Amino acid sequence: MPSLSQSRRIIQQSSIRKIWNQIDTSPKHGVCVPLFSLYTQESCGIGEFLDLIPMIDWCISCGFQILQILPINDTGSCSSPYNSISSIALNPLHLSISALPYKEEVPAAETRIREMQQLSQLPQVHYEKVRSMKRDFFQEYYRVCKQKKLTDHPDFYAFCEQEKYWLHPYALFRSIREHLDNLPINHWPTTYTDLSQITEHERTFAEDIQFHSYLQYLCFQQMTQVREHANCKSCLIKGDIPILISKDSCDVWFYRHYFSSSESVGAPPDLYNAEGQNWHLPICNMKTLQQDNYLWWKERLRYAENFYSLYRLDHVVGLFRFWVWDESGCGRFEPHDPKNYLAQGQDILSHLLTSSSMLPIGEDLGTIPSDVKRMLESFAVCGTRIPRWERNWEGNGAYTPFDQYDPLSVTSLSTHDSSTLASWWKESPQESKLFAQFLGLPYSSTLSLHNHTEILKLSHKTSSIFRINLINDYLALFPDLISKTPRYERINLPGTISKNNWVYRVKPSIEDLSSHSKLNSLLEALF
């Protein structure tokens, strides 16, 4: 493991040293929470963009410097933030209705807003109701904006021109998709899959295109407001940019030369999943992306840097190679030859890392070749360390001491794809007993408040530069702040289609978090 001084030398020799110099290498503490999980008294059934403003205030008051969120791209009728229908467009579900000018002129606005706000009291996010009620409200609100000439504002036209690379294709795709009742692309009539007929469709759906474009303009306005507040509070927002995209996305429809839908991407068999995983997501054609100088990727990063200071590069190994499933169910690595996948990864990293002002943090969990890890380190790209999984798997299985983590990393006790710390402790008694012995803590079958607090403290004292935990693991210090139903506390169970995936709601409102003096004092004492 390199020392901090060695890591600093790596940083200064890297192409992203200027970005690192802005962030600096002093320890950074943070909290991770999906936006959909948050709510305030004004939220309409789901976490909204402007909810991040009081959330930032809470983070700073507790001593956190980083607020990490999951992807906030438009997911259409899907709830998974990692299965979006656009790699760039934001999800209008997160628009803060209470902040929209002239909202009161929408018919029955007060009653409708109150009904949507009541959905925030449900123990889980109810996407179907929220999506339906917000969609109807936005349609009415758009008509109000048209009457007020807000859609004729020069700023809106400037936004459409600035973002034309992705905005117009997205708005047209959205319009066609809704016209076809959200049919998958492979069931669309050929008239809509034939891109040579786009001009005709643009005329047909002109009003719908402007509607979806205007919603994106509002999303942009609200998220830039969040970023400005974060800057004022010296809080770093860490976004999440997936490598992959839904097969039923605008990108696959419009930029089809960048993707192959005949095979799908997943994960190979490992210690935790003997059969591997098929994510049913299309493969990126890296050669075509390279020929276009990675324009698709660069546009994604350019737009995201309006909102984030750092970003989680999901499944970073995919820049080097994918685990590919063919139609018969057989899997393979592509490219397979280390010489080829290292050359591919080096080329794309050298282009992408300097095209953005954001600091990348790689999600390098799972089966990652050692030569890929070394190359990421040479680019000064941080990796991810999950203490329960950091073990000498090739030897005696001993846990890795917390002070032996690579400084170029982020430590997190749990992820959105794992159980919470308390659930893992209870569900995996053999592992948690070894973990307690490793940490010198007394073992009990249920994670005690003492052990929970000590493990959180230790996670904020690892040798990683970044120490960021799920909000669930902090709130569990107070039983009244979490659900009595354990499955409600888990964000996602990979490889499953479940009504409990991606519906996690933080039990206390942000107002309640802010006023919980005991929790806030305890969190402040962790660092």
UniProtKB/Swiss-Prot annotation:
SUPFAM superfamilies, per the entry: (Trans)glycosidases (SSF51445)
Main localization of the protein described in the UniProt heading: cytoplasm
Top-level taxon in the UniProt lineage: Bacteria
Reactions catalysed, as given in the entry: Transfers a segment of a (1->4)-alpha-D-glucan to a new position in an acceptor, which may be glucose or a (1->4)-alpha-D-glucan
Any GO molecular function: 4-alpha-glucanotransferase activity
GO-annotated cellular components: cytoplasm
Family as reported in the entry's similarity comment: Belongs to the disproportionating enzyme family.
Cited NCBIfam families: PRK14508.1-4 (NF011081)
Protein name from the UniProt record: 4-alpha-glucanotransferase
Species: Chlamydia trachomatis serovar D (strain ATCC VR-885 / DSM 19411 / UW-3/Cx)
